[in-house]
């Protein structure tokens, strides 16, 4: 029965897509068809399925008169006419005659056609199966299990899911002769289990990282197993995401830290003391202090060896983090610069003068001033093609970076859009109106609004998303998990006891397996700390 099920599954997908598969839902594609191995021609009659030695002959009687003429007439009919004739014929058969037909037909559909194909072609056929069906197919028979462990087959499945690293496991059990372990299959299974943990795994007690006393954590970075928190207490702290220990405290700023970036062993911070500092994360040493701004450094964006900083002095500066040299100064805004994006080629800035500007940093030229917002610009996203800006005027605007034209104005939020994230034309925006929206920036359509009975009860403070989930935090003291595709609420990941009475989740950062939350309060009801939740699985 398993063989019948999987053949029907494969054939259905084959029929759905046609002989040449031109498009796949969710961007999925099968393994490339092996060169020079076309699919065998579809049998024209049931006789083509049967080996002569397997045919059941009734030799006890002579063929009735007119049988050949009747068969010739049957062959001349169309497909629908043949089906009608068979229906009428079955209605006139006795049970023993129907049983005879079943004994002839059923064995032919229980044959393992996959085992008759060349290995390359069999793998191509199996590539049409979803991973869950492929795992079930491995239980069908020994040969199918060998095929279903093929590493290249699972590599393609991993690519479809955005998994780019195989997983090598030291197994205690000896694998049976003839079977090989697929690292790509292990990687796929691990990711599936991690996703399940996020959705419904037991929420273990988080690691609690206490620091910064009762001050506000203003910025948060998370890379590898290292967490960096910046605070208005003038310091940054470097933490181990594994042990929860504070590895070092970065002391040197004489004002609150309001922005930071991190890459590898380099940390960059911006402060109300009007400077940026470049730190060695391993040693805690301050490598450079970058002087030039005349007011608070409010935002920054790091790309390779350069960082662009935006300040309340209305300027932006481009710095070389290796030498500490200021390479360029971008002047043109007439109010504080609140947000900046930099892709190595273009700088995009948003400011309290209601403007968004696109710059060529090498020539210090403003290429476009994007006008349209009627209040302060607080958030930006830039993918090299589109600029997306969020404003206190409640709107979000999508711009063409080359022409400066406004492509779409996204309306629906009721207050300040404080945070956004953009990936592959999907934008997720968080707003002070307590809602989160998912947009398609190509069409300007709002795909989902994350609301309902489980929605946030106060302003959304931070968000992050991947191909499956949206994670949001709020002034209401909760961190929520949502389904990206459906917009459905999944569950609360964090709920502060002081939520609703002052407890706040200021910032969140997530990796594939961990969630870091910066929490505290403005009225002393919640101690300032970091919470680290782990969703990893043990594949030993």
Put a short name on every predicted segment.
Residues 1-107, 153, 159-161:
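Extended intrinsically disordered, low-complexity segments enriched in serine/proline/acidic residues
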Residues 220, 236-240, 260, 270, ...:
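WD40-repeat beta-propellers
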Residues 210-217, 251-257, 291-297, 331-337, ...:
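WD40/WD-repeat beta-propeller blade N-cap
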Residues 204-207, 245-248, 285-288, 325-328, ...:
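A structural motif specific to WD40 beta-propellers
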Residues 21, 28, 35, 47-50, ...:
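Intrinsically disordered, low-complexity acidic/Ser/Thr/Pro-rich linker and tail segments
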Residues 368, 394-396, 400-540:
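Structured C-terminal portions of repeat-based eukaryotic scaffold domains
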Residues 230-233, 270-273, 310-313, 350-353, ...:
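Conserved strand-to-loop turn within each blade of WD40 beta-propeller repeats
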């Amino acid at each position: 029965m398993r063989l019948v099920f999987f053949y029907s599954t494969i054939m259905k997908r084959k029929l759905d897509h046609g002989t040449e598969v031109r498009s796949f839902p969710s961007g999925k594609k099968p393994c490339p068809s092996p060169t020079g191995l076309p699919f065998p021609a579809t049998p024209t009659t049931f006789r083509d399925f049967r080996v002569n030695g397997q045919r059941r002959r009734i030799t006890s009687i002579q063929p009735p008169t007119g049988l050949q003429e009747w068969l010739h007439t049957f062959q001349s009919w169309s497909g629908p006419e043949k089906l009608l004739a068979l229906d009428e014929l079955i209605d006139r058969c006795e049970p023993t005659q129907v049983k005879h037909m079943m004994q002839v037909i059923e064995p032919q559909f229980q044959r393992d056609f996959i085992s008759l194909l060349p290995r390359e072609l069999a793998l191509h056929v199996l590539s049409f199966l979803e991973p869950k069906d492929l795992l079930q197919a491995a239980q069908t028979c020994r040969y199918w299990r060998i095929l279903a462990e093929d590493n290249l087959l699972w590599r393609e499945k991993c690519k479809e899911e955005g998994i780019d690293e195989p997983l090598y496991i030291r197994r205690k059990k000896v694998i049976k002769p003839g079977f090989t372990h697929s690292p790509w299959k292990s990687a796929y299974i691990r990711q599936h289990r991690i996703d399940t943990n996020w959705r419904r795994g037991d929420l273990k007690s988080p690691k609690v990282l206490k620091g910064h006393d009762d001050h506000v954590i203003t910025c948060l970075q998370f890379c590898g197993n290292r967490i960096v928190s910046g605070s208005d207490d003038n310091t940054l702290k470097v933490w181990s995401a594994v042990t929860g220990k504070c590895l070092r405290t970065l002391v040197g700023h004489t004002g609150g830290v309001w922005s930071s970036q991190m890459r590898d062993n380099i940390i960059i911070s911006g402060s109300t003391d009007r400077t940026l500092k470049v730190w060695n994360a391993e040693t805690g040493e301050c490598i450079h202090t970058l002087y030039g701004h005349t007011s608070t450094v409010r935002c920054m964006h790091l790309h390779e060896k350069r960082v662009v900083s935006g300040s309340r002095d209305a300027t932006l500066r481009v710095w070389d983090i290796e030498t500490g040299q200021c390479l360029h100064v971008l002047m043109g805004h007439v109010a504080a610069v609140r947000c900046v994006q930099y892709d190595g080629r273009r700088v995009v800035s948003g400011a309290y003068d209601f403007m968004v500007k696109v710059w060529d940093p090498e020539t210090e030229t403003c290429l476009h001033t994007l006008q349209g917002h009627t209040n302060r610009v607080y958030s930006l996203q830039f993918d090299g093609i589109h600029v997306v800006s969020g404003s206190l005027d409640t709107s979000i605007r999508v711009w063409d970076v080359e022409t400066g034209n406004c492509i779409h104005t996204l309306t629906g939020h009721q207050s300040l859009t404080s945070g956004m994230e953009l990936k592959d034309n999907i934008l997720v925006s968080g707003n002070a109106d307590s809602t989160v929206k998912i947009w398609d920036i190509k069409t300007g359509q709002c795909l989902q609004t994350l609301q309902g009975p489980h929605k946030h009860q106060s302003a959304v403070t931070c968000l992050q998303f991947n191909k499956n989930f949206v994670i949001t935090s709020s002034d209401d003291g909760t961190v929520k998990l949502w389904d990206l595709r459906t917009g459905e609420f999944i569950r609360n990941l964090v709920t502060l006891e002081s939520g609703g009475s002052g407890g706040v989740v200021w910032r969140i950062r997530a990796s594939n397996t961990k969630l870091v939350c910066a929490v505290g309060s403005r009225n002393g009801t919640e101690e300032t700390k970091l919470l680290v939740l782990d969703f990893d699985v043990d594949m030993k």
